[in-house]
Amino acid sequence: MGEVKTAIGLMSGTSMDGIDIAVLRTDGESVVRHGPSGYFPYDPGLRGIWQKALTTAKAIRERRERPGDLGEAERKLTLAHAAAVKSFLHRHRFDVGDIDVIGFHGQTVLHRPDEALTVQIGDGALLAEETGIDVVYDMRANDMVHGGQGAPLIPAYHMALSANLPDGFETPAVFVNIGGISNLTYIGEGGRLAAFDSGPGNMLIDQWIEAHTGKAFDKGGRTAAGGSVVASLVARYMESPFFSANIRRSLDRSDFVPPQKGEVSLADGARTLSHLTGAAILKSASYLPEAAKTYVVCGGGRLNPVIMEELAGLAAKQGARVIAAEEAGFDGGAMEAEAWAYLAVRSLRGLPLTYPGTTGVKEPVTGGVLVRA
């Protein structure tokens, strides 16, 4: 075992609703102890800035460019993360010296793997200065330099967690992370990894609900629960080349868009998109080395009972079971933030963050940029 570090992971996903924070004690190979976790929502005004940044970022041709007001958005995003870290440390009675490193994801504003271009705004140096803690950030870029898709990165952490799956779960088990975009991690015999983005997660549902109601998401799946699946709309989405391509690739939030207003009712749209999330997962799972017997679901999507119902119903037809991460003894809400803590420690040790079976990179590579406080 290597030197055990206490790391904080920070994650701001495609939903752009807030910051997930988690503490992890790890040597970058095994998980020694799970620490506290938390969630800090963005102020509504800041969320609007991040949404505007998505449009501005379309002009980027080189990953260090910050056109228009993107530089100011990056500064505000970093300061919001710093404030969240300080509040979290105070709440859980940590001193700055108790934390060895922060794993900082930032906010993805552009992801074009076919152009080897990915941009996560977030100033690691400013975060280190504001918090007084060393920071590892920009963890996707080196993978792309070496021919990878830059995503997903969480499979390395899923592999560590798989060693702690309780007895009684049929294998092979597949971890399913339902964030804005969903991704799958298969862990086979001997630690064989296969992982890739599986399709839209919460993203289209969130966009649909916000466009019609002004609310950020379908809380508890209440809107979707009152609707019906529009099969023709599902079929249209499933005709996307993404689902038929032999080579799996990572997704950008612009790869799929919600239906046009008026195309279906609010409730039917929400239900259909919830079904699509499940259908996309099962379709993409057909590219795994073998069929899953258990799907372990983490991320915000596990809290939407309609998504879970649709996924479970589709999986049952294939003889598989769907469970929330908590049923396997994990914290499904903190898992992505924990992953960034874990990856930061791996980066410090020069261990691989990505593998040929996860991002398509030519060989296992490390990543991340370290900034000392």
Swiss-Prot record:
Binding site for ATP: G13, T14, S15, M16, D17, G18, I19, D20
Matches recorded under InterPro entries: Anhydro_N_Ac-Mur_kinase, ATPase_NBD
One Pfam family from the record: AnmK
Keyword set, alphabetical order: ATP-binding, Carbohydrate metabolism, Kinase, Nucleotide-binding, Transferase
Top-rank lineage group of the source organism: Bacteria
A GO term, aspect molecular function: kinase activity
Catalytic activity, reaction form: 1,6-anhydro-N-acetyl-beta-muramate + ATP + H2O = N-acetyl-D-muramate 6-phosphate + ADP + H(+)
Gene Ontology biological process terms from the UniProt entry: 1,6-anhydro-N-acetyl-beta-muramic acid catabolic process; amino sugar metabolic process; peptidoglycan turnover
HAMAP family, per database record: AnhMurNAc_kinase
Entry protein name: Anhydro-N-acetylmuramic acid kinase
Source species: Agrobacterium fabrum (strain C58 / ATCC 33970)
Recorded name of the encoding gene: anmK
